[in-house]
Amino acid sequence: IKNEVAPIPFHRAQIASNAEGDALDVVRKSNIKWIPKNETHGWLYDRLMQYMSIANNNLWHFNLESILDSIQYTQYHGNEKGFYGWHMDIGPQELAFRKLSLVVQLSNPSDYSGGDLQIRSGHGEATVSKTQGTVIVFPSYLLHQVTPVTGGLRESLVLWSGGNSYK
């Protein structure tokens, strides 16, 4: 995956909503690139959507209609203390249709320190395995964060699927 998308440039991540007026680096510090859905990357979209469908069919039974965005390839650099504070992947306007979020752990856990993906639910907080290749799917309304990376480089893929309003 890394080699396949290497020609796509990274840029500094933005956030969709910043109602509190926080400076961006207080909320998130990472670099991203968007992997287009095309003939080259179609296999990746198909595979990730299979994971989403399996998780949804077994756990939530949401009405999913489509992938809502391109796949986000994210880098958190230890020399920048890269992180993404507590947030939800839903919000106003187009973000209102997100129902499931998917994260793929691309980095080997020995390549970085810190950078835990933590998810909060009614059952408390859970830290996701750092094992390379781990795929986690969760409802987009759950609070989650990536703790500061204190060394090395953490890389991941993120994808969202959605549909009409919850019923």
Where are these regions (language model features)?
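Fe(II)/2-oxoglutarate oxygenase catalytic core
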Residues: 1-135, 141-167
